[in-house]
Amino acid sequence: MEDFVRQCFNPMIVELAEKAMKEYGEDPRIETNKFAAICTHMEVSFMYSDFHFINERGESIIVESGDPNALLKHRFEIIEGRDRAMAWTVVNSICNTTGVGKPKFLPDLYDYKEDRFIEIGVTRREVHIYYLEKANKIKSEETHIHIFSFTGEEMATKADYTLDEESRARIKTRLFTIRQEMASRGLWDSFASPREAKRQLKKDLKSQGQCAGLPTKVSHRISPVLKTLGHMWMDSSRTATLRASFLKCPKK
């Protein structure tokens, strides 16, 4: 699974996921299913915000090619992927600027058009069950919840799906592709089933063997939204701008 993750996801997403796990004392080389889940959640969060802007009239528009006009504002503020201290700094700044209530838990995005925080969920189970779990945990009407599944289902607060159908279809297609690629490599069952995942983890801990090598050819899709946010994720010793691409899993 670890090799699959490193081949299937953009290197910057992989790096952010590794940092997030290490922040909580977790090892991505051992908890590989969780590693895959975090990478998937990050990519969905980034895809959710990608290409969406607000024009000078306050209208939400989509810009898919080239650099957006300077008058355009990113519709979504990305919170997911930042270290906790920076993430809370961003949340506090948004709350102070907009007057929205501060969430109890860190959300994934902020929607400047609808003036609300968004919690993104990606589940291997039934969407309504996961939605209820999220809602019960958050217990806040100010945080909008949007759940996606690997089977193409989705569920959102008050059936308000925020994005246009095409943008959501792109996310669903990506999730379905990840599922198919995992299944073709015999990884899906352990990823989808907690019991099977626990059994596989024990097996991996005993063997510490490497997974079969995967093809290295990948295709890149540039994300203009994340280009401008790159420096927010960088360590102080790094000055390069973040350029995240959304990768399709390599073909067999």
Curated annotation (Swiss-Prot):
Primary location recorded for the protein, binned into one broad class: host cell
One family name in Pfam for this protein: Flu_PA
Site (Important for efficient shutoff activity and nuclear localization): 195, 198-199
Function as written in the Swiss-Prot or TrEMBL entry: Plays a major role in the shutoff of the host protein expression by cleaving mRNAs probably via an endonuclease activity. This host shutoff allows the virus to escape from the host antiviral response. Hijacks host RNA splicing machinery to selectively target host RNAs containing introns for destruction. This may explain the preferential degradation of RNAs that have undergone co- or post-transcriptional processing.
Organism: Influenza A virus (strain A/Swine/Iowa/15/1930 H1N1)
Family: Belongs to the influenza viruses PA-X family.
Active site positions: 80, 108
Biological process according to GO: viral RNA genome replication; viral translational frameshifting
Protein's recorded name: Protein PA-X
InterPro entries: PA/PA-X, PA/PA-X_sf
Site (Important for efficient shutoff activity): 202-203, 206
Keyword list, A-Z: Decay of host mRNAs by virus, Eukaryotic host gene expression shutoff by virus, Host cytoplasm, Host gene expression shutoff by virus, Host mRNA suppression by virus, Host nucleus, Host-virus interaction
Domain notes: The probable endonuclease active site in the N-terminus and the basic amino acid cluster in the C-terminus are important for the shutoff activity. The C-terminus acts as a nuclear localization signal. The C-terminus is recruited to host protein complexes involved in nuclear Pol II RNA processing.
Cell compartments where the protein resides: Host cytoplasm; Host nucleus
A GO MF label: RNA binding
